[in-house]
Amino acid sequence: MQDAAPRLTFTLRDEERLMMKIGVFVPIGNNGWLISTHAPQYMPTFELNKAIVQKAEHYHFDFALSMIKLRGFGGKTEFWDHNLESFTLMAGLAAVTSRIQIYATAATLTLPPAIVARMAATIDSISGGRFGVNLVTGWQKPEYEQMGIWPGDDYFSRRYDYLTEYVQVLRDLWGTGKSDFKGDFFTMNDCRVSPQPSVPMKVICAGQSDAGMAFSAQYADFNFCFGKGVNTPTAFAPTAVRMKQAAEQTGRDVGSYVLFMVIADETDDAARAKWEHYKAGADEEALSWLTEQSQKDTRSGTDTNVRQMADPTSAVNINMGTLVGSYASVARMLDEVASVPGAEGVLLTFDDFLSGIETFGERIQPLMQCRAHLPALTQEVA
């Protein structure tokens, strides 16, 4: 028997506002986002991610995003020790989809902005204008030390200065095809990129620190943030408010997209049993690595993403917001997310991506008021 969930009551004005976008955070690294010996164990492949994104497109997901990870956490599960590369993966996925928006992540310490500008323009051509770029500054020092490109620990406090110059070069090249930018980190001398993107290139960021939000307010089209807690869907609201306030200072509209993991089943009890099983198998060695790395940055303050990721409360899934319950309960909680001012969308992960997306599309999404505008499904995806 499926658990009943109370219906939210919205005014017409609220319903018009509550049209929340849904994205999938594809598993570019092994085992997705569960650091547990009890979770599904799998390697990242193009075929797996193709199946995930095609299924997401079938169920009217709005976008797909891949991260970039250059060194994992080890442990019994070898967590994130095995990763594909973001731009090449998303170029492939752009070629086998037709509607869904596609976002790759640039580890900006590893890629010159002029190269990213050209790669993005190429994937814009492949996708027919469906591509955008997520910019990350880099927080896990061993990822870059192993290649001899870590700029020193002062970078922790200057990384958004670096990113500000980086995005200015990108905007020059995408907008005019030329850059003569001169800064502390980058020097462009009649740098050229052509062809330019067919549509304005979307730039996204995932800043939760004051510096990160100030950057997003000035340069990003929207900002990712972590959900918080287990079955506390609106606990992230203060973060969304901070983002709105930062954007108001720049006169721009920059909404928040919130990261959640969905663990759903027929009943609340069945879903909770899954969650407890995953927690019981937590890979303590990999989690210790995460905690150790989070303590390396002593200069960025206490409000960065990595501080939340390593919190012992729910480190088994890096402390992203977690929605555990029946299909109706998860639908209700996602409608609550949509009710938060500034929350324009969610980025979802699943304990099992293929079955999770299908269950979401068939059993959860039809119950969501904030997705009531979607057309009916017309065909099946294998």
Curated annotation (Swiss-Prot):
One of its GO terms (biological process) is nitrogen utilization. It catalyses: uracil + FMNH2 + NADH + O2 = (Z)-3-ureidoacrylate + FMN + NAD(+) + H2O + H(+); thymine + FMNH2 + NADH + O2 = (Z)-2-methylureidoacrylate + FMN + NAD(+) + H2O + H(+). Transmembrane segments: none annotated. GO terms for molecular function: alkanesulfonate monooxygenase activity; uracil oxygenase activity. FMN binds at residues 68-69, 134, 143, 159-160, 209. InterPro entries: Luciferase-like_dom (IPR011251), Luciferase-like_sf (IPR036661), Pyrimidine_monooxygenase_RutA (IPR019914), SsuD_RutA_monooxygenase (IPR050172). It is an enzyme of class 1 (oxidoreductase). Pfam families: Bac_luciferase. The keyword RNA-binding does not apply. Its EC number is 1.14.99.46. This is Pyrimidine monooxygenase RutA. The lineage of its organism: Bacteria, Pseudomonadati, Pseudomonadota, Gammaproteobacteria, Enterobacterales. The gene is rutA.
